[in-house]
Amino acid sequence: MGDAPSPEEKLHLITRNLQEVLGEEKLKEILKERELKVYWGTATTGKPHVAYFVPMSKIADFLKAGCEVTILFADLHAYLDNMKAPWELLELRTSYYENVIKAMLESIGVPLEKLKFTKGTDYQLSKEYTLDVYRLSSLVTQHDAKKAGAEVVKQVEHPLLSGLLYPGLQALDEEYLKVDAQFGGIDQRKIFTFAEKYLPTLGYSKRVHLMNPMVPGLTGSKMSSSEEESKIDLLDRKEDVKKKLKKAFCEPGNVENNGVLSFVKHVLFPLKSEFVILRDEKWGGNKTYTIYQELEKDFAAEVVHPGDLKNSVEVALNKLLDPIREKFNTPALKKLASAAYPDPSKQKPTAKGPAKSSEPEEIIPSRLDIRVGKILSVEKHPDADSLYVEKIDVGEAEPRTVVSGLVQFVPKEELQDRLVVVLCNLKPQKMRGVDSQGMLLCASVEGVSRQVEPLDPPAGSAPGERVFVQGYEKGQPDEELKPKKKVFEKLQADFKISDDCVAQWKQTNFMTKLGFVSCKSLKGGNIS
């Protein structure tokens, strides 16, 4: 074998560890003639986490295969996706992403000089690109645009036009970046097939699409920037890494939905081609695995203990993160990180309260006083057959009276002594003569027969514990929500139950210090 890899060897490097390839025959033809031009794009929204090492390891493979690789910081996409990145923060977020992605690549030994970096707004605001957006919008149906973005663009009841434009812009990027292939997660598949359908209608060629698997989070679900307990941030301290791994789901012998084992498979093995289990001599001493399936087999047979697996992952992961932490331990990058991701709960109070501003009032979930409650008693409302009157302990000197319309949906005995989730800072309201001092939050699904389930706080929760949306735990709730301002109603529009039955606001989990708030079974339900 010579120094330069053969087309077959290049194909192996490009496609290994991928979940799916669309256009493999075209890929083979290109590799016979010249080097492949490929790009990977990332919308500059939430902070990148350790699962980003999966695309980084593939970028290393692409370079080994001789590919010309472009990394796109999709700043405009970050804004179009329900303004996940506010316009005024776009430049800062993009700078943060560029610095952290480059630090990740350096951490795994990827030469940066072989890569091209670009921003979406470097070319997406040009006359030619804008004209193509209009041309494409005249051909694409609303149905196809919404379907294409279903796994990527935030889904809301009343979608913004910007979110429908998102897939079209991503398709056009393939043409304007002059690439043969686009690389992304399997969650991008619908956008990729959208591009294959519509680019030829503009006279542009169909591209190859390369897809890596989505990395399960430490809780067993997909690793997500919006689930604090499911992911490890690239700048997490060593003690935070230890804490998150210690709490991660890793049942002895269970290889299904095992977030720690999956992390080894999808992140650590592709980067190092081996993994060492570190353990005391009395338990067999250290053992090196060069084939992932052998590690999985030993774990299933309980030859490898969860504690040893977690400790070994912790050591390996910190080796990857140390160079990134060191790079960001400078005043300039510390300042960049705090400016790009400002603490939403920080306010400047005055002696007379918050200063009045001409800016629109900030509608954020930390304004809601949501707590764990325990139902001490349940009675039928004396004047309304559909209402219960509950006495609920929410951590105050006296229990609160809460009226809820659950008679048709939840038997009285299921509510007695149950832990529930209560919104405590609504203005008290008379309901058929009884003052209701809160709202018992429930999941619901509409249909032929409406289904309703009270939200459940994590097991072991205590009355009065605060329920918050991850990232907004430090904010102070309003003393009382003013009905005219409709703060709760505006926030509630983005309340939803995930496919894992977790309560969310804008795809970010409701949680307590013990874990996530959930419901029993109503996937995709609303919350009220």
Curated annotation (Swiss-Prot):
One of its GO terms (molecular function) is small molecule binding. It comes from the Eukaryota. The modification N-acetylglycine is found at G2. A motif (Nuclear localization signal) lies at residues 242-247. It is found in: Cytoplasm; Nucleus. It is an enzyme of class 6 (ligase). Resveratrol strongly inhibits the tyrosine--tRNA ligase activity. InterPro entries: aa-tRNA-synth_Ic, NA-bd_OB-fold, Rossmann-like_a/b/a_fold, tRNA-bd_dom, Tyr-tRNA-ligase, Tyrosine-tRNA_ligase_regulator. L-tyrosine binds at Y39, Y166, Q170, D173, Q188. The modification N-acetylmethionine is found at M1. One of its GO terms (biological process) is tyrosyl-tRNA aminoacylation. A motif ('KMSKS' region) lies at residues 222-226. Its EC number is 6.1.1.1. The modification Phosphoserine is found at S205, S386. Keywords: Acetylation, Aminoacyl-tRNA synthetase, ATP-binding, Cytoplasm, Ligase, Nucleotide-binding, Nucleus, Phosphoprotein, Protein biosynthesis, RNA-binding, tRNA-binding. The nuclear localization signal, which mediates localization to the nucleus, is also important for interacting with tRNA(Tyr), suggesting that it is sterically blocked when tRNA(Tyr) is bound. PANTHER family: TRNA-AMINOACYLATION COFACTOR ARC1 FAMILY MEMBER, TYROSINE--TRNA LIGASE, CYTOPLASMIC. Belongs to the class-I aminoacyl-tRNA synthetase family. Homodimer. Interacts (when binding to resveratrol) with PARP1; interaction stimulates the poly-ADP-ribosyltransferase activity of PARP1. This is Tyrosine--tRNA ligase, cytoplasmic. It comes from Rattus norvegicus (Rat). The lineage of its organism: Eukaryota, Metazoa, Chordata, Craniata, Vertebrata. The gene is Yars1.
